[in-house]
């Protein structure tokens, strides 16, 4: 039986991995193992080597307290791969962890085929990473159509597969969703996304809650829905809401939440693409540790953090980053989107134009495309060889 070792370090990567495993198992027999979350464990029928929350970290300074734990997990993963006798290693995003593992595995198992899914954003910062990936991996799958040339010119086989949100089912019946969420006819709905990392949630909650309280002063028919990347996050958020006057609820059904909302307050990330694809206007707010921020500013070579703005070359979606991540600024702009239908409509239309450029309205299935490449070019030769030996 063909063995594939997977590594994903966060929820978005776990989702991609789970979908790819489902397609791989359609017509070939494989054994999956490695590091992943609920999607990969369910699809691959395996138990993750450890919880992905252990490596779901971001930022330069934020990682420092966990550096020795991360090193141990890298050691543990490398050892597990070498003992697994896997035929293929597939790493998904989380470059801080997956690249370090792959680099060491390459030295120990030089003949092992290795694929990385989600090309590093070398067009944004640290372009030298393209060279490093070309030295380690056999193939790279890119989510954005303009990314492959950054790697193919270095001799690395890089394929554009499309973004995973292309194969998600978005909701459009707002009337039905309002009934499902028990939202009154006169209520305005604000969706709030805080991220999947505990550190992100704790860092953004105070300013997000203050922003909402400012809005509530002039809008007492406001209902707030906090989207949960993990049901356990409700316990982290609740202490910050003990004295608030606005109505709120929690939801783990993020796509429904995005669609039912009149506007969204979002932290930077993949969620912004999902919100835009749901046809909901938003503002993006984000901050990191101060030292991490200055390091990032030295490395980064783009003006915006939201992918839609980056592609557009202009601020379609208002961004409030670091020192501008303040309740007074955020609340003013959110009120514009909640009560100025023209402003909200303009943002939605411009965002849709960018999504079309990225192919988000095509019939592509990134996970199916990835699975077919893996089967035809990386597994079929191995499967054929095994059959000949039998």
Curated annotation (Swiss-Prot):
EC number from the UniProt entry: 2.4.1.182
Source species, domain of life: Bacteria
Reaction catalysis annotation: a lipid X + a UDP-2-N,3-O-bis[(3R)-3-hydroxyacyl]-alpha-D-glucosamine = a lipid A disaccharide + UDP + H(+)
Pathway: Bacterial outer membrane biogenesis; LPS lipid A biosynthesis
Protein's UniProt keywords contain Oxidoreductase: no
GO process terms (BP): lipid A biosynthetic process
A GO term, aspect molecular function: lipid-A-disaccharide synthase activity
Keyword set, alphabetical order: Glycosyltransferase, Lipid A biosynthesis, Lipid biosynthesis, Lipid metabolism, Transferase
One Pfam family from the record: LpxB
One annotated Gene Ontology cellular component of this protein: membrane
Signal among keywords: no
Signal peptide annotation: none
InterPro entries: Glyco_trans_19
Record SUPFAM superfamilies: UDP-Glycosyltransferase/glycogen phosphorylase
HAMAP family on file: LpxB
Function of the molecule: Condensation of UDP-2,3-diacylglucosamine and 2,3-diacylglucosamine-1-phosphate to form lipid A disaccharide, a precursor of lipid A, a phosphorylated glycolipid that anchors the lipopolysaccharide to the outer membrane of the cell.
NCBIfam families, sorted: lpxB
Family membership: Belongs to the LpxB family.
Protein name: Lipid-A-disaccharide synthase
Organism from which the protein derives: Rickettsia felis (strain ATCC VR-1525 / URRWXCal2) (Rickettsia azadi)
This protein's encoding gene: lpxB
């Amino acid at each position: 039986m063909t063995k594939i070792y997977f590594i994903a370090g966060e929820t978005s990567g776990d989702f991609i991995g789970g979908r790819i495993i489902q397609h791989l198992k359609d017509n070939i027999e494989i054994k999956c193992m490695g590091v992943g979350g609920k999607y990969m464990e369910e699809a691959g029928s395996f138990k993750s080597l450890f919880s992905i929350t252990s490596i779901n970290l971001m930022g330069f300074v934020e990682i420092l307290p966990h550096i020795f734990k991360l090193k141990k997990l890298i050691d543990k993963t490398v050892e597990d791969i070498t003992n697994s006798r896997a035929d293929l290693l597939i790493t998904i995003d989380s470059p801080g962890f997956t690249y370090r593992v792959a680099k060491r595995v390459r030295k120990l198992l030089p003949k092992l085929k290795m694929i990385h899914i989600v090309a590093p954003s070398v067009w944004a910062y640290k372009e030298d990473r393209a060279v490093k990936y070309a030295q380690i991996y056999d193939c790279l799958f890119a989510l954005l159509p303009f990314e492959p040339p950054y790697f193919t010119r270095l001799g690395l086989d890089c394929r554009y597969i499309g973004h995973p949100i292309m194969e998600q089912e978005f909701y459009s019946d707002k009337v039905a969703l309002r009934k499902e969420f028990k939202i009154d006819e006169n209520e305005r709905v604000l969706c709030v996304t805080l991220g999947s990392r505990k550190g992100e949630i704790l860092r953004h909650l105070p300013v997000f809650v203050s922003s909402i309280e400012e809005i509530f002063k002039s809008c007492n028919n406001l209902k707030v829905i906090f989207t949960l990347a993990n049901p356990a996050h409700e316990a982290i958020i609740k202490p910050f809401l003990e004295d608030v006057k606005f109505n709120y609820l929690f939801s783990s059904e993020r796509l429904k939440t995005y669609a039912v909302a009149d506007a969204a307050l979002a932290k930077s990330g993949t969620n912004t693409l999902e919100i835009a694809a749901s046809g909901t206007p938003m503002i993006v707010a984000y901050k990191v540790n101060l030292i991490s921020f200055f390091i990032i500013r030295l490395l980064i070579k783009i003006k915006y953090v939201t992918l839609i703005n980056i592609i557009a070359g202009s601020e379609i979606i208002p961004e409030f980053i670091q020192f501008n991540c303040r309740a007074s600024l955020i609340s003013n702009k959110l009120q514009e989107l909640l009560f100025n239908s023209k402003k909200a409509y303009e943002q939605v239309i411009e965002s849709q134009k960018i999504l079309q450029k990225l192919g988000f309205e095509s019939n592509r299935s990134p996970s199916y495309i990835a699975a077919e490449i893996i089967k035809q070019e990386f597994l079929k030769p191995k499967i054929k060889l095994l059959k000949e030996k039998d």
